[in-house]
C-alpha cells in the first residue's frame, strides 16, 4: 500500500472510530463521518492504483467538502437543532447542500468547495473557544491546518520532510475528527438563568 492510500485508510479508520464513539442522538456527526469515510474509502482504492475510482473519489470528496464539515459544525454548535439530531434532516441537507456544491463545481465555481469547509471550520473554532474545550480547540486547529495545507501547499512539496499535500490533508483531518468527536456537548445557557 502506498503512502497516499495509507493516509486515506487512516482517515477512514478515524471517521469510523469517531462515528462509533458518538452517542445515538448526534445524527449530524455520524452523517459527516459517513461522508468523509466514503470519500476516504474510495480514496484508498484510487491511490492503490484503481483508475476507475478517480471519478467517484472526486465526487465524494466534493460532496464531503460541501456537506460534511457543516454537519460537523451543526452537531457541535447547535446540538439541539433538528439537523443535529435527526437522520432524515441530515439526508435532506446532504442532498441539498451537497448537490448545490457538486453543481457549483461543475459550472466553474470550484471555490464553493473551499469556502464552505473554511466557514464551517471557523464556526467550529469559535464554538470550541466559547465552550473552553481544549480537545475541541486542538481539533479545530487541525481542521483549519488541513484546509490551509490543501489550499496553499504545492502537490510536490514535502511537509515536515515526510508528507506530501495529500497525506498531510488526510492525517490532519483524521486528527481533527478524532479530537472533535470527543468533545462533550454543553447545553446552551437558557435566558434568564445565569450560567453556573
Question: Which stretches of residues belong to each language-model region?
Answer:
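Membrane-proximal helix-loop-helix units in multi-pass membrane proteins
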Residues: 58-128
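N-terminal topogenic module of multi-pass integral membrane proteins
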Residues: 1-55, 183-196
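Aromatic-anchored segments of alpha-helical transmembrane domains
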Residues: 37-45, 93-105, 142-155
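Hydrophobic core segments of alpha-helical transmembrane domains in multi-pass membrane proteins
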Residues: 32-36, 113-123, 138-144, 167-173
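Membrane-interface helix caps and helix-loop-helix hairpins in membrane proteins
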Residues: 49-55, 101-113, 156-163
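Hydrophobic cores of alpha-helical transmembrane segments in multi-pass inner/ER membrane proteins
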Residues: 8-20, 63-79, 119-126, 170-187
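Membrane-interfacial loop-to-transmembrane alpha-helix junctions, especially the N-terminal start
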Residues: 24-36, 81-93, 132-143, 190-196
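C-terminal transmembrane-bundle signature of multipass membrane proteins
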Residues: 130-196
Amino acid at each position: 500500500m502506498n503512502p497516499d492510500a495509507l493516509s486515506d485508510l487512516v482517515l477512514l479508520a478515524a471517521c469510523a472510530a469517531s462515528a462509533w464513539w458518538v452517542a445515538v442522538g448526534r445524527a449530524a456527526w455520524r452523517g459527516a463521518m459517513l461522508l468523509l469515510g466514503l470519500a476516504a474509502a474510495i480514496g484508498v482504492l484510487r491511490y492503490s492504483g484503481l483508475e476507475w475510482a478517480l471519478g467517484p473519489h472526486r465526487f465524494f470528496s466534493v460532496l464531503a467538502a460541501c456537506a460534511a464539515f457543516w454537519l460537523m459544525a451543526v452537531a457541535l454548535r447547535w446540538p439541539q437543532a433538528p439537523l443535529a439530531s435527526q437522520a432524515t434532516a441530515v439526508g435532506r441537507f446532504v442532498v441539498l447542500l451537497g448537490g448545490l456544491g457538486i453543481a457549483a463545481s461543475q459550472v466553474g465555481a470550484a471555490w464553493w468547495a473551499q469556502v464552505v469547509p473554511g466557514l464551517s471550520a471557523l464556526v467550529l473554532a469559535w464554538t470550541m473557544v466559547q465552550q473552553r474545550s481544549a480537545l475541541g480547540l486542538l481539533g479545530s486547529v487541525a481542521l483549519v491546518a488541513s484546509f490551509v495545507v490543501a489550499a496553499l501547499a504545492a502537490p510536490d512539496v514535502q511537509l515536515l520532510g515526510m508528507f506530501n499535500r495529500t497525506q498531510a490533508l488526510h492525517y490532519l483531518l483524521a486528527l481533527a475528527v478524532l479530537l472533535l468527536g470527543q468533545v462533550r456537548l454543553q447545553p446552551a445557557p437558557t435566558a434568564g438563568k445565569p450560567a453556573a
